[in-house]
């Protein structure tokens, strides 16, 4: 029982350190410049993440939820748009998955 208690305390300390390292947030204004507040299911934990840069994969699901946070990822950075990448050949079958920040 003593070992289990020590393990539990150690585990809790690790969890607290990891939460602090990722910069939890409640809204975008809690984050640094160039970052947004993102809710990442299934853990329903919100962390500050960087806005996406040119050429990075993006998704239209990077929209606000009712709590004023982004879901899964930040949108493209300032002046960029999430657009379908122009592809041809066999990869054209996967066009819906070829969204990038341009």
Swiss-Prot record:
Residues 1-21 form the signal peptide. InterPro entries: Atracotoxin. It is found in: Secreted. It comes from Caerostris extrusa. Belongs to the neurotoxin 20 family. Keywords: Neurotoxin, Secreted, Signal, Toxin. GO terms for cellular component: extracellular region. This is U3-aranetoxin-Ce1a. One of its GO terms (molecular function) is toxin activity. Expressed by the venom gland.
